[in-house]
């Protein structure tokens, strides 16, 4: 698969007057790190985390993917000053982005590597994923798969003897990530 890196943008909006980050953002980042994903907290406005993000992108072909208005193009402008790519404010009426980026464009990065800026995604969903394969897409669940009472037939929901549920209850898997898995499974 393609290695994913999570970049939480606009963190300046979640900082208090002492530059301390909101606890819910810290918790979310910690949960994804525990699951094995690199997580970067960045701000295009104040420059926080940009050097670490450049290091993560250096020498790679990367794609910026996310909903409209999350700051993908603003991040790219901050990572490589001088690009001057057009950005818009989030709509005050709808609270959503305005799809300023209308087509994907590949940029060579002066610090090494290249990055594809993409239009905002309107909706994320499941496509042709077998519900029984879904647990394998959650790295933190993989060590427990096959160790349930019902083996690989376990849905990891309410079944007795579920190793995944035991790991959730024991704090080894984030309850929020487990709930996300259950929500996706119900959509599959």
Regions found by a protein language model. Name each.
Residues 1-5, 11-20, 31, 38, ...:
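Helix-rich effector regions associated with P-loop NTPase G domains
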Residues 5, 13-70:
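Canonical P-loop GTPase G-domain recognition
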Residues 59, 81-82:
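Short, well-ordered coil loops that connect the C-terminus of an alpha-helix to the N-terminus
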Residues 61-65, 76, 92-97:
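Short, surface-exposed loop/turn motifs that are enriched in glycine and acidic residues
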Residues 64, 77-81, 87:
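Conserved ATP-binding TGD loop and adjacent catalytic N/P-domain core of P-type ATPases
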Residues 68, 73-74, 78:
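Walker A/P-loop
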């Amino acid at each position: 698969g393609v290695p994913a890196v999570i970049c939480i943008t606009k963190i300046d909006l979640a900082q208090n007057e002492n530059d301390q980050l909101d606890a819910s953002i810290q918790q979310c980042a910690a949960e994804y790190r525990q699951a094995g994903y690199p997580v970067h907290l960045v701000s295009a406005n104040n420059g926080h985390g940009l050097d670490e993000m450049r290091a993560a992108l250096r020498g790679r072909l990367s794609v910026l993917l996310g909903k409209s208005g999350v700051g993908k193009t603003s991040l790219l402008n901050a990572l490589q000053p001088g690009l001057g790519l057009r950005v818009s404010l989030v709509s005050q009426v709808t609270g959503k982005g305005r799809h300023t980026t209308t087509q994907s464009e590949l940029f060579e990065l002066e610090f090494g590597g290249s990055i594809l800026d993409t239009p905002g995604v309107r909706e994320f969903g499941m496509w042709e994923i077998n519900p029984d394969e879904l647990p394998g897409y959650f790295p933190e669940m993989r060590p427990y798969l096959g160790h349930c009472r019902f083996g690989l037939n376990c849905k990891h929901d309410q079944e007795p003897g579920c190793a995944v549920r035991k790991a959730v209850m024991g704090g080894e898997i984030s309850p929020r990530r487990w709930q996300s898995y259950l929500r996706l499974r119900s959509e599959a």
